[in-house]
Amino acid sequence: MRDLEQTAVDNGATYIKLMEKAGTAAAEALIKYGAESKKVVIICGKGNNGGDGYVIGRVLKKYNCKVDIIRLGEPRTTDSKLNAEKAIKLDIAMVNFPEDKETAFELIKNADYIVDAVYGIGFRGALDENTAEIAKFVNTSKAFVMAVDIPSGVGCDDGSVKGECFKANLTVTFTTLKPAHILYPSMDYCGKTEVASVGISDELINLSEYIMQTTDEFLGEKLLPERKISSNKGTFGTLLAVVGSYGMAGAAIMCGKAAQRSGAGLVNIALPKSIYPIVAGKLIEAVFTPLAEKNGISSAEDCNKLVSLANKSNAVVLGCGMGHNEDTEKIVCEILTNCKKPIILDADGINSIVPHIHLLKKAKAPVILTPHPGEMARLLGCTVAEVQQNRAEIALNFAKEHNVSLVLKGANTLISDGNILLVNRTGNAGMARGGSGDVLAGMIGSLAAQGINPFRAAVCGVYAHGLAGDRTAKRLSETTMLPTDMIEDISF
């Protein structure tokens, strides 16, 4: 973001104008959350984040807010000094901390809204003693807290939190999301994150090393093309799903049903013959390819049949509840290297490719991987903690290195093709259940089978999957909802 701001300045913008736009956007966001005519305390640091805070104070005065500013030192930058002087001319009260600690704490105690404008995206390490003290007091208040850009105390690039940190209800950031908004533990301190424009053009944003957007921004208002009245089932493609094993029939059922709900013209379920009666009894609209098996897992002796079916289909899902052994590895590798249709690898499809990860680059068709953090750790040979600490970097680098689309699941699922990084904001904690991933894989596979660009299919699938989960949570609750309930709430 710092490089992007400099590029904007090099192309005619000024830092003072960017600060004015940032502060105005943040103030208007706070008004949207009910701050008009309320008591607002703004805590300003010494740098440009504090400068944003002074602008916020001026703008809020126009909305009849009772504004007080707590200053953690004198402004040090030219633009921050200028905006502090403007705020003083409007008779906005200034309290210095820690010099007048008692007054500052009394203001915080009585505030309806508090703005954290102490540190911005350049912060590293831990808060100093005075800032940590005021952050701790703010966190005990009942006020609505808004952070400017990122909560003070979090590391912007790595999401680290070292000691006390402001905890926000709302974070207003500018132009693009930052890693701290999607990484742990910093994400838990951001509350809801909104991205505001400061007038930097899309052309300049696109010059960035990579673009970080939300899925809804990327997709736009129209998720899918209209279904023409002259269409037939062939128009919407055939999905081959190689899924299920003994004890995991449910994965096949959820994947298949979700694919049907997501619009595929035909869904062909290839599965061990022993579980065929169970799955067929639940998916009466699907067609089936029973497979030879060993110990309840599909046997590699049907590899040629599966490769042929894959190439006759429009997309392939591999792995949901499939099991993992040498046979599944052979099935996955044969389809990966011989199929010319989009392939979605999930669950045991991912586990089966781990020993043969070099084959991803040899795939003849677009490949989408949908790992959860544990599967991502196996792909990389690292720990889950390392994945969670570096989600953005890992998603980008893995997708770029292996020429795939990667869906790194979790709260704020990430999707990347190696050039763009998308953050999904739909979904809820009620979706953290076995089976949710099977539903997602079926949805993405269904969209790809309908001829939608595979990367867009992944993005659209993740977004719609989260929306379905949100509808289900509203209809039932996060505690009681199940993945099978979510399937009934899929809508495009």
Please annotate each region the language model reported.
Residues 1-72, 170, 181-343, 351-368, ...:
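Small-residue (G/A/S/T)-rich helix-start motifs and N-terminal tracts that mark the onset
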Residues 27-118, 126-148, 331:
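Nucleotide and nucleotide-moiety/phosphate-recognizing core
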Residues 76-79, 130, 164-167, 271, ...:
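Short acidic-hydrophobic sequence patches enriched in Asp/Glu that either
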Residues 99-102, 152-156, 179, 349-352:
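Short acidic loop-to-helix transition motifs that present clustered carboxylates
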Residues 102-104, 109-126, 314-323, 401, ...:
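Glycine-rich phosphate-binding loop
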Residues 108-112, 165, 310-311, 336:
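A short, aliphatic-rich alpha-helical micro-motif
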Residues 112-113, 118-120, 124-212:
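Internal gly/pro-rich beta-alpha loop/helix module
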